[in-house]
A protein has these predicted regions:
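Terminal low-complexity/charged segments
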Residues: 1-206
Length: 206
């Protein structure tokens, strides 16, 4: 179920700077970055208690504004969804305010968005990479990043020392991967790291 039909109208009545955003599924608005936190706080107060997703759009080099941050929020009591989009004003160093103060779950969403797009979330309590390693020089979801990737030297990190755990972590680069092509069960046939090719029905290999 989407947001009530008058949700967008009510929001624009309180925030005249908000404009309609074309959308084929959810009610959606565009919000100036200077007002995005005020709008998100208002939605939270109106019952949108869950940040379902936070992502970004890279409109490619030469576009201005180049980056748009998109929030998908849900009022769980009503089953009502709403979409908010805001443009980053600085194309060279895109930034928006952090929404962690409104929805604590925004923490990892914003870290992923920073990791993949290089967008800074100002006021985030721990803004660092979440998928790639510290020091990785690229932002893989930017339009200029090639589909085939860029060959990069992996850092020689002592995982146990860094994570302070005795658990042997999977290889940072993944693999070596193995697959059981003769398996009828798709789960069993799925390629996986060799040292993790075990489950509750199949003993861990020595």
């Amino acid at each position: 179920m989407s947001a009530p039909a008058d949700a967008t109208t009510a929001l624009k009545g309180k925030f005249p700077q908000v404009t309609d955003r074309p959308s084929g599924d959810l009610p959606a608005v565009n919000v100036p970055v200077a007002d995005v936190i005020a709008v998100l706080k208002h939605l939270r107060a109106e019952g949108y208690d869950m940040l379902v997703d936070l992502t970004a759009i890279d409109w490619a080099e030469g576009a201005s504004p180049r980056f748009t941050v998109v929030y998908h929020v849900l009022a769980t009591a009503k089953g009502a969804y709403f979409r908010v989009a805001t443009n980053c004003l600085n194309d060279a160093a895109p930034a928006v305010p952090s929404a962690v103060q409104i929805w604590p779950g925004a923490n990892w969403h914003e870290r992923e968005c920073y990791d993949m797009f290089g967008i800074q979330f100002e006021g985030h309590p721990d803004l660092r990479r979440i998928l790639m390693w510290d020091g990785y020089p690229y932002f893989p979801l930017r339009k200029e990043f090639p589909l085939a990737g860029i060959e990069t030297v992996l850092p020689d990190v002592e995982i146990a020392a860094e994570t302070k755990t005795k658990v042997i972590a999977a290889p940072m680069a993944g693999g070596p991967f193995v697959a059981s092509s003769g398996e009828m069960n798709l789960t069993e046939a799925e390629p996986r790291a060799k040292d993790e090719s075990w489950n509750e029905r199949k003993e861990k290999p020595e």
